């Protein structure tokens, strides 16, 4: 699992194509919309939560095997904004 490093300002994500998608009950969310088709279902992009967790936008679709997220966040890895847990 990947997370943003401590102290990273979420607004920096705009530089990498992420858009603020609102504050839901669980905090601010930033989304980079890209088509990620797995078993005929579109995961709709990469979502970063206020506490730094990085996941696919729809991480709980049943009966599919999720791909490794690493290839989809290479820009953040190269910019040294994330850590692997």
Where in this protein do the model-derived segments appear?
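Short active-site oxyanion
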Residues: 1
């Amino acid at each position: 699992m990947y997370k943003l490093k401590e102290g990273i300002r979420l607004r920096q994500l705009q530089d990498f194509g992420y858009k603020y998608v609102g504050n839901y009950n669980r905090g601010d969310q930033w989304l980079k919309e890209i088509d990620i088709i797995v078993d005929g279902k579109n995961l709709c992009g990469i979502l970063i939560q206020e506490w730094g967790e990085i996941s696919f936008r729809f991480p709980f679709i049943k009966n599919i095997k999720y791909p490794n997220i690493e290839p989809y966040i290479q820009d953040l890895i190269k910019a040294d904004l994330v850590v692997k847990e």
